[in-house]
């Protein structure tokens, strides 16, 4: 954490964004790069980080560029049959969209920092457990500060002009139209 903060020594946070970090080599054998990615978002150094099913941090542009993107947001504590069913049915519908190339879809399981906090600060082991479960079922994970869905879609729009979809439950859909968010 201190190393990450030191990267901003004498630099305004809004003048520099660090959107990925990867530590390799013998001196960093005990470092889980997913924790470093989480810290980037938690400390406000970037708004989103991505890691692939093999647990490797990746640049968002490398994962999302020119892709059709389908995301599901949740706490995934744990991943439930309902989550899996929602993504399966959503993906089936998304593939049927006329402008979607079914061979060019990137599915993301998004967890917001607020979903990680629960009732206090983020429990890093809990985060790793959730990430491990998602990765073990072959999913790409997005950790973000995007509380509002339109901000998430804006983030996707920086990387693709293709189709985008966000899967949500009925309660969330109703909540989106609540005036307090606008």
List each language-model region with its residue ranges.
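Nucleotidyltransferase catalytic core that binds NTPs
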Residues: 1-182
């Amino acid at each position: 954490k201190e190393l990450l903060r030191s990267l901003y020594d004498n630099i305004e946070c809004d003048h520099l964004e660090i959107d990925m970090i990867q530590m390799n080599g013998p001196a960093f054998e005990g470092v889980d790069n997913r924790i470093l990615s989480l810290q980037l978002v938690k400390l406000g150094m970037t708004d989103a980080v991505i890691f692939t099913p093999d647990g490797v941090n990746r640049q968002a542009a490398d994962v999302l560029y020119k892709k059709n993107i389908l995301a599901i947001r949740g706490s995934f504590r744990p991943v439930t049959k309902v989550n899996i069913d929602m993504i399966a049915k959503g993906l089936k519908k998304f593939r049927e969209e006329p402008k979607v190339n079914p061979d060019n879809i990137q599915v993301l399981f998004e967890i917001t920092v607020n979903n990680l906090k629960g009732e206090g600060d983020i429990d890093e082991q809990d985060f790793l457990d959730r990430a491990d479960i998602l990765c073990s079922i072959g999913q790409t994970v997005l950790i973000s500060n995007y509380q509002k869905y339109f901000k998430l879609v804006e983030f996707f729009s920086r990387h693709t002009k293709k189709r985008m979809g966000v899967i949500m439950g009925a309660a969330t859909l109703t909540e989106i139209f609540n005036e307090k968010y606008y």
